[in-house]
Swiss-Prot record:
Subcellular location: Virion; Host nucleus
Function noted in UniProt: Forms an icosahedral capsid with a T=7 symmetry and a 50 nm diameter. The capsid is composed of 72 pentamers linked to each other by disulfide bonds and associated with L2 proteins. Binds to heparan sulfate proteoglycans on cell surface of basal layer keratinocytes to provide initial virion attachment. This binding mediates a conformational change in the virus capsid that facilitates efficient infection. The virion enters the host cell via endocytosis. During virus trafficking, L1 protein dissociates from the viral DNA and the genomic DNA is released to the host nucleus.
Lineage: Viruses, Monodnaviria, Shotokuvirae, Cossaviricota, Papovaviricetes
Assembly information from the UniProt record: Self-assembles into homopentamers. The capsid has an icosahedral symmetry and consists of 72 capsomers, with each capsomer being a pentamer of L1. Interacts with the minor capsid protein L2; this interaction is necessary for viral genome encapsidation. Interacts with protein E2; this interaction enhances E2-dependent replication and transcription activation.
Family named by the database record: Belongs to the papillomaviridae L1 protein family.
Keyword list, A-Z: Capsid protein, Disulfide bond, Host nucleus, Host-virus interaction, Late protein, T=7 icosahedral capsid protein, Viral attachment to host cell, Viral penetration into host cytoplasm, Virion, Virus endocytosis by host, Virus entry into host cell
Matching InterPro entries: Capsid_L1_Papillomavir, Capsid_L1_sf_Papillomavir, dsDNA_vir_gr_I_capsid
Molecular-function GO term, any one: structural molecule activity
Gene Ontology BP term (one): virion attachment to host cell
Protein name: Major capsid protein L1
SUPFAM superfamilies: Group I dsDNA viruses
Record carries keyword Disulfide bond: yes
């Protein structure tokens, strides 16, 4: 980075050369006129919308958690274009170039009807409605109620060649000289982590780690009470020097405060009064004997609502074309992979399934003999338009790529070749027998996946590419908008008129 910094005086001096500069992929990647279409199978998932259903011993997950308020992080793998047997070998010289994919367009298809799902908690920490209070209510030791609500409406997707980065607030470590922190609010710090498949997004209670910041397990709904709600870190990804984590994003969020409640429990930060020399600055105390003499809780909070769900505001089931990315990477898929992070709770209907606990079936309604179950289903289909590109193998370009990610050059088999060793080595015939020494313990080195520690929904596209773009819906849309589709005109056939050279004599009538 070239930054102008102040010197010891009052004059700002320019940076001293040489200064490293990150080039855009448009400066060294050569694009061709060859396009491929790739589409996935229909991707389905079924589970419980609030939590994992485990076995009796708790060791095995029998029904996974599948919520409409979860991120779907797809890791899409494409074939290596350098292994393609191209019909026209004049496209590139393998001694001078390497082939890469560039994303030109995509469409995220979503099945299932639009619907609003609710979430809640059977022991939700709320005292009462504070919007329209009729009397001053005193609290007890436990005022939790069974409450449900609909979450904030979210539609969002982020694409890149590295995983999407998320942010959330968590408990920060206290200083050594802080003393006893029992009963005090912990310090907070902003943390970053990769958004994995199944992570929860914000539904109206903020992007925080509820596992460490919700001691009573009643401040939020069941689906996030034991989870960390993440929000995409758009600021960090937009300032990424290489621009790999976010080519572009589409976002639509909406909510409004539907109900206004107050928390139960003692107030941690009391309203300033005379004990801190702030008497009568915030309120005038009530008379003795009145209920208002003892102040109620002032920890107010709303439960939000996502409001109307309509097909007019859908971001899915429509194509998006990438002409210019927000960062230096203009859609080049390094490593032949793409990460698609999706958040959508506009299809948030939860199925209610009832079964009888009696073998013969019930003749009359009895709630004790009926068992209710909850299930949530999701349906996706991913389609892409890929452009074949060439990367020249010159020193300047290879230096840039090596500084960005040395694993790319290893995949291209352009690694450093050591000088051959001319020394004589010993080779035993029966190395595994007891008559010879133990074989050298050389572990087999396997290439480490840089994203293997994260959980993604893996989508294999290695056998899904096609040059026949006009045979697919997204391909036809791409050909039309790019002006590459040839118009098929049909000549209008007219009936032939036969002309006779002989003149017809008219008969004279009398």
């Amino acid at each position: 980075m070239t930054l102008w910094l102040p010197a010891s005086g009052k004059i700002y001096l320019p940076p001293t050369p040489p200064v490293a500069r990150v080039q855009s992929t448009d400066e060294y990647v050569e694009r061709t006129d060859i396009y491929y279409h790739a589409t996935s199978d229909r991707l389905l998932t079924v589970g419980h919308p609030y939590f994992d259903v485990r076995s009796q011993d708790g060791q095995k997950i029998e029904v996974p958690k599948v919520s409409g308020n979860q991120y779907r992080s797809f890791r899409v793998t494409f074939p290596d274009p350098n292994k393609f047997a191209l019909a026209d070998m004049s496209v590139y010289d393998p001694d001078k170039y390497r082939l890469v994919w560039a994303c030109k367009g995509l469409e995220i298809g979503r099945g299932q009807p639009l619907g609003v799902g609710t979430t809640g908690h059977p022991l939700f920490n709320k005292v009462r409605d504070t919007e329209n209070s009729s009397n001053y209510q005193n609290t007890s030791t436990d005022d939790r109620q069974n409450t449900s609500f609909d979450p904030k409406q979210v539609q969002m997707f982020i694409i890149g060649c590295t995983p999407c980065l998320g942010e959330y607030w968590d408990k920060a470590p206290v200083c050594d000289n802080a003393g006893d922190q029992t009963g005090l609010c912990p310090p907070l710090e902003l943390k970053n982590s990769v958004i994995e498949d199944g992570d929860m997004f914000d539904i109206g209670f903020g992007n925080i780690n509820n596992k460490t910041l919700s001691f009573n397990r009643s401040d939020v709904s069941l689906d996030i009470v034991n989870e960390t709600c993440k929000y995409p870190d758009f600021l960090t990804m937009s300032n990424d020097v290489y621009g790999d984590s976010c080519f572009f994003f589409v976002r639509r969020e909406q909510c409004y405060a539907r109900h206004y409640f107050v928390r139960g429990g003692a107030v941690g930060d009391a309203i300033p009064d005379g004990t801190v020399n702030q008497n009568h600055n915030y309120y005038l105390p009530a008379k003795n004997g009145q209920g208002q003499r003892t102040l109620g809780n002032s920890t107010y909070f709303p439960t939000v609502s996502g409001s109307l769900v309509t097909s007019d505001a859908q971001l899915f089931n429509r194509p998006f074309w990438l002409q210019r990315a927000q960062g230096h990477n203009n859609g080049i898929l390094w490593g032949n992979q793409m990460f698609v992070t999706v958040a959508d709770n506009t299809r948030n209907t939860n199925f209610t399934i009832s079964v009888s606990t009696e073998n013969g079936g019930a003749q009359e309604y009895d709630s004790a003999n009926i068992r209710e179950y909850l299930r949530h289903v999701e349906e996706y289909q991913l389609s892409f338009i890929l452009q074949l590109c060439k990367v020249p193998l010159n020193a300047e370009v290879l230096t840039q790529i090596n500084a960005m990610n040395s694993g790319i050059l290893e995949n291209w088999q352009l690694g450093f070749v050591p000088t051959p060793d001319n020394s004589v080595h010993d080779t035993y015939r029966y190395i595994t027998s007891k008559a010879t020494k133990c074989p050298d313990a050389v572990p087999e080195t396997e290439k480490e996946d840089p994203f293997g520690q994260y959980t993604f929904w893996n989508v294999d596209m290695t056998e899904k590419l096609s040059l026949d773009l006009d045979q697919y819906p997204l391909g036809r849309k791409f050909l039309f908008q790019a002006g590459l589709q040839t118009a098929r005109t049909r000549a209008v056939k007219r009936p032939l008129v036969r002309k006779s050279s002989k003149s017809v004599k008219r008969k004279r009538t009398q």
